[in-house]
From Swiss-Prot:
The gene is htpG. SUPFAM superfamilies: ATPase domain of HSP90 chaperone/DNA topoisomerase II/histidine kinase (SSF55874), HSP90 C-terminal domain (SSF110942), Ribosomal protein S5 domain 2-like (SSF54211). Pfam families: HATPase_c_3 (PF13589), HSP90 (PF00183). Coiled coil: none annotated. This is Chaperone protein HtpG. It comes from Legionella pneumophila subsp. pneumophila (strain Philadelphia 1 / ATCC 33152 / DSM 7513). Disulfide bonds: none annotated. GO terms for molecular function: ATP binding; ATP hydrolysis activity; ATP-dependent protein folding chaperone; unfolded protein binding. InterPro entries: HATPase_C_sf, Heat_shock_protein_90_CS, HSP90_C, Hsp90_fam, Hsp90_N, Ribosomal_Su5_D2-typ_SF.
Length: 623
């Protein structure tokens, strides 16, 4: 008998999610069972964990399992567990809302294309809502462990925007979900069909999944039998686990629909005993860049589930890695706070980090195509590595990929090792340029002398690149050198001597230009880096780079006041023309225009663009 029944509306995001699930995932209907079994498994994990400190939660029933029953007459499938269960408040919160951060942003990414959307929804994890792919009504009966039988609840919805919830006496703890199947989904009333789905997706679940036994004639008996392997897969030796088993376990722990790119499974013995199973996903999760989103590994202690998203076992730049740590020596009552200062955790973290970097190095060496797929998804995150992880800086540096002037493509596919192997004879530096975009970097006037001499330059246009080169200042004994900061020394003594001679000759012109630009520049110098452009702006060796200044200003940060150096090309026709201008106003117009042109060529912004346009127009008229 249901009492105190109420009708409530779903959260807006849930309505959208239900619509998307039903319409985008209908071609892979069977995943509903995987999702509901996965939820039941989580409920059993949580009960066992909480019962460590409160044994009464077992209520004299510690035989934990998941049960699946089919009723052909009523056209229903019931998935039940004797796990932690739900209270009234938890049912409303967990079944009526989506508590995940970034839900709105996620939904805004959906395109209406079924193939793309099903992949996105898969990586978001639809969980309970997948029931509505096959059912036109879902009934949930549940009672949280430790509450009275009278506190049992019954929740029901047709997936049409609202649900009812009320109290109903339930003598046993746990959750029972009954799916009232749509007529076209009667295939799921077949015992063998359900067993096949369990074998395909949920064989690795470490809790027993039981169904009624079948007689030789195919009839149900009253006895139940376990229909999955019911072992903690990661505790087995590699030789006992198939590739398909590894992939299905990954999908279970990650809620991802795609196979992982690779994985590493290790049993460590010695002073500390633990098992790690680490996966590299094939695509980035939708919340990879959301700072509040948690990314971590599942932690078990002696096969007992302790927590999801334990962030202490990998540095943040490896937050895309999914997997399991099962430690034998950590206390069962360990908390997130204790994990922070635990020596064994530090040891496992160091080992996991090296394991992931080793996996990636192996992939980069043996399967360049797959590694490029990885880089396209996670390269930006990996670039955070040298900034965060000094100890592994060299290993990470080998994994980085860049666009260069030699590759001729925006695709980042050149390693630093490849760059070094192609260096010119006598070249002792790795040259790079940072800019706000690939096109800005590729077309920078700073590249002119390097193109002429055939010297390769890294083209860095990701925001993180500015920080990266600040922390990673050399590779393989070669210093990383910005071509837009300080002087460029290319070992050309003849050019250096020529510049010195020209400086003496052009000293009056340089002084005149300085007097015009005055406070806008730190200095005016002759350049040896330009062949085609009249001028460029560079940062002083000791100053913050111009692109870094722009990034910090855009973020609202205070930036130390630093002025650029204005370098002029004495061989360019426009600079030669300055010699002949007698009128001070005309001279000022030309110099200011050349300076502002150089700022724009470097991707900079002008305080007054209208003034620049007027200046150019006046010069065009007077030419």
């Amino acid at each position: 008998m249901v009492s105190k029944q109420q009708t409530m509306g779903f959260q807006t995001e849930v309505k959208q999610m239900l619509h998307l699930v039903v319409h985008s995932l209908y071609s892979n209907k069977e995943i509903f069972l995987r999702e509901l079994i996965s939820n039941a498994s989580d409920a059993l994990d949580k009960l066992r964990f909480l019962a460590l400190s409160n044994g009464s939660l077992f209520e004299n029933d510690s035989d934990l399992k998941i049960s699946i029953q089919i009723n052909e007459k009523l056209q229903t499938i019931t998935i039940s567990d004797n796990g932690i269960g739900l209270s009234w408040e938890e049912a409303v919160e967990n079944l009526g809302t989506i508590a995940k951060s970034g839900t709105k942003e996620f939904i805004s990414q959906l395109t209406g294309e079924q193939a793309k959307d099903s992949q996105l929804i898969g990586q978001f994890g639809v969980g309970f809502y997948s029931a509505f792919i096959v059912a036109d009504k879902v009934t949930v009966k549940s009672r949280r462990a430790g509450l009275q039988p009278e506190d049992g609840i019954v929740w029901e919805s047709k997936g049409d925007g609202e649900f009812t919830i009320g109290y109903e006496k339930k003598s046993t703890r746990g959750t029972e979900i009954t799916l009232h199947l749509k007529p076209e989904n009667d295939e799921f009333l077949s015992d063998w069909r359900i067993r096949g789905i369990i074998s395909k997706y949920s064989d690795h679940i470490c809790w027993p999944i039981v169904m009624k036994k079948l007689s030789e004639e195919g009839k149900e008996s009253k006895e139940f039998e376990t229909v999955n392997k019911a072992t903690a897969l990661w505790t087995l030796q590699k030789s006992e686990i198939s590739e398909e088993d590894y992939k299905q376990l990954y999908k279970h722990i990650s809620h991802d629909y795609m196979d992982p790119l690779t994985w590493s499974h290790n049993h460590v013995e010695g002073k500390h005993e633990y098992i790690t199973l680490l996966y590299i996903p094939a695509h980035a999760p939708f919340d990879l860049w959301q700072h509040e989103a948690k990314h971590g590994l599942k932690l078990y202690v002696k096969r007992v589930f302790i927590m999801d998203e334990a962030t202490q076992f990998l540095p943040r730049y490896l937050r895309f890695v999914k997997g399991i740590v099962d430690a034998s020596d950590l206390p069962l009552n360990i908390s997130r706070e204790i994990l922070q200062d635990n020596k064994q955790v530090e040891s496992i973290r160091a080992a996991c980090t090296k394991r992931v970097l080793s996996m990636l190095e192996k992939m980069a060496t043996n399967d360049k195509e797959t590694y490029q797929k990885f880089w396209n998804e996670f390269g930006l995150v990996l670039k955070e590595g040298p900034i965060e992880d000094f100890a592994n800086k060299e290993a990470i540096a080998k994994l980085l990929r860049f666009s260069t002037t030699a590759s001729g493509s925006e695709k980042q596919e050149v390693s630093l090792e490849e760059y070094v192997s192609r260096m010119k004879e006598g070249q002792d530096k790795i040259y790079y340029i940072t800019a706000s975009s690939y096109n800005a970097a590729k077309n920078s006037p700073h590249l002119e002398i390097f193109r002429k001499k055939g010297i390769e330059v890294l083209l860095l246009s990701d925001k993180v690149d500015e920080w990266l080169v600040g922390y990673m200042n050399e590779f393989a004994g070669k210093k990383l050198q910005s071509i837009s900061k300080g002087k460029v020394e290319l070992g050309d003594d003849e050019t250096s001597e020529q510049i010195k001679e020209q400086e003496k000759t052009l000293e009056p012109l340089i002084k005149h230009i300085k007097s015009v630009l005055n406070e806008r520049v730190k200095d005016v110098l002759l350049t040896n880096r330009l062949t085609d452009s009249p001028a460029c702006v560079v940062a002083d060796e000791q100053d913050m780079g111009l692109e870094m200044q722009r990034i910090l200003q855009a973020a609202g940060q205070q930036v130390p006041v630093s002025k650029p150096i204005f370098e002029i090309n004495p061989d360019h026709a426009l600079i030669k023309r300055l010699h002949d201008i007698q009128d001070d106003n005309q001279f000022e117009l030309w110099v200011t225009m050349l300076f502002e042109q150089a700022v724009l060529a470097e991707g900079g912004q002008l305080d007054n663009p209208a003034d620049f346009v007027n200046r150019v127009n006046r010069l065009l008229v007077s030419s």
